[in-house]
């Protein structure tokens, strides 16, 4: 089965991360569950810095309702990586992020995944429309269609 290409040029924003000692598992590479932590860090850092998300006192919060990851190459401590981020789908109350983990400066991803947030009212836990500042932040990195990428 041929893997789809996940190239650096297909991602619009990058979050630098340094792997940590405890990221490695018994097999000497970053454990698969740790990639989800990297995704969470990249998405939430972006939303806080660019969209004004207030994770401590804001009226809305983002709940992860779906996530997945495909692994192509191992990474290990100590490495500097960059998590590429683009927005795959922007709905009324949900966002699908498309993410990829790259070794610093490399063009081909070591892993790629998706992460879906539904934004909810902090008190009621009911879905709400994405506030305009967050929506604008997401629109900045909405991914082009595969056909547009080939142009």
Task: Please give the residue ranges for each predicted region.
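Conserved small/polar residues in nucleotide/adenosyl-binding loops
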Residues: 141-146, 150
């Amino acid at each position: 089965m041929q893997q789809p290409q996940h190239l650096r040029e297909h991602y619009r924003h990058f979050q630098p991360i340094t792997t940590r000692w405890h990221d490695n598992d018994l097999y000497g590479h970053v454990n698969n569950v740790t990639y989800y932590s990297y995704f969470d860090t990249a998405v939430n850092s972006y939303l806080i810095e660019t969209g004004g998300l207030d994770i401590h006192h804001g009226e809305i919060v983002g709940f992860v309702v779906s996530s997945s990851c495909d692994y192509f190459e191992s990474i290990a401590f100590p490495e500097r990586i960059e998590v590429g981020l683009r927005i795959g789908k922007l709905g009324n109350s949900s966002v699908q992020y498309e993410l990829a983990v790259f070794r610093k400066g490399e063009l081909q991803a070591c892993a790629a995944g998706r992460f879906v947030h539904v934004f909810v009212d902090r008190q009621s836990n009911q879905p709400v429309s994405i506030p305009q500042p967050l929506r604008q932040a997401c629109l900045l990195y909405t991914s082009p269609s595969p056909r547009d990428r080939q142009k």
